[in-house]
């Protein structure tokens, strides 16, 4: 998915990364002091040092005591304080013996170490772990970005992005990267990719809203009209939305409003039978506004939650069919008008969406065949050009093959290898 678009982005990243590498300069390493993380770690570090100091003091005290006893006669009256000191020295001496015994048991036979050699290597409370973080910094001006940004714009246009969308993305990347000093690590591609992701995310996130929350809070029945040209997956998208609503516990009735195309009523009827929902229809050639009106009245009478109306495929230049669409919207006011087109149609789909939006304002789009789209132009451009969000992606022929649009997920797909 989006393989050709990924190639174009990859070329830009490579070109700009080279420029950044050439201009990047080393900066002084940052010294990061890592203090102990918790009280437990403090206790673990303090314990060996305290134990070591206590044993050293005990040994020193014993040595001086022995010298004193050898040089002086026995003293008959010993002060209480001295008795306490003697008792303390005895406890420390016992502690030393226990410590040495424990260490001897833990050591392998071929490698004997003293108790002090065992505890000294441990990190003490007064010691700090220091790490050096080496960074580089780079300052980019307009001249540095001139050639890479030109390549980016050409790549976007070749990927079927609308000119205004390409310009918006290029301008965003330029504003993010020029005029400020940025710290970078060893991977210069990260700074470039981050700027690109942010720029594209801004474009595809235009006026997004949650379809599920929106319809949940609308007064029932909710009326949704689907528009677009023939052969783009409009009827299939209606069946997928029907399946989604049924899975959410709603009731649905379909309106066979495409009375212009031969076989359209039968095609929608097949989906209605498979999904187990009612379809309201008239004979071929009937007034589609009357069919859709009857479907809405049926939903009200039977307390149906949703009316999904199919319409004849039409171009905005077909004045009769556009007048028909205006009549449908006037007779049975829709809560949502959804434009359906193929992602693989690229910039053509974007132009059609813009033209429909001018004639009969749409509320959002469904792009079908997104799994077969190598360029990604329509998916990136359509929300920006119309000012109306992408609601769903069609990703296959099954009823479950409908992906709710998530801007961040979509941008990740553009960069995933």
UniProtKB/Swiss-Prot annotation:
EC code: 3.6.5.4
Classification via Pfam families: SRP54, SRP54_N
Gene3D superfamilies: P-loop containing nucleotide triphosphate hydrolases (3.40.50.300), Signal recognition particle SRP54, nucleotide-binding domain (1.20.120.140)
The keyword Transmembrane helix is assigned to this record: no
Annotated membrane topology: Peripheral membrane protein
Positions that bind GTP: 228-235, 310-314, 368-371
Intracellular or extracellular location(s): Cell membrane; Cytoplasm
Domain of life: Archaea
GO terms under cellular component: cytoplasm; membrane; plasma membrane
Keyword terms of this UniProt record: Cell membrane, Cytoplasm, GTP-binding, Hydrolase, Membrane, Nucleotide-binding, Receptor
Any one of the GO BP annotations: protein targeting
Role summary: Involved in targeting and insertion of nascent membrane proteins into the cytoplasmic membrane. Acts as a receptor for the complex formed by the signal recognition particle (SRP) and the ribosome-nascent chain (RNC).
Quaternary structure and partners: Part of the signal recognition particle protein translocation system, which is composed of SRP and FtsY.
Protein name in the entry: Signal recognition particle receptor FtsY
Organism: Methanosarcina acetivorans (strain ATCC 35395 / DSM 2834 / JCM 12185 / C2A)
Lineage: Archaea, Methanobacteriati, Methanobacteriota, Stenosarchaea group, Methanomicrobia
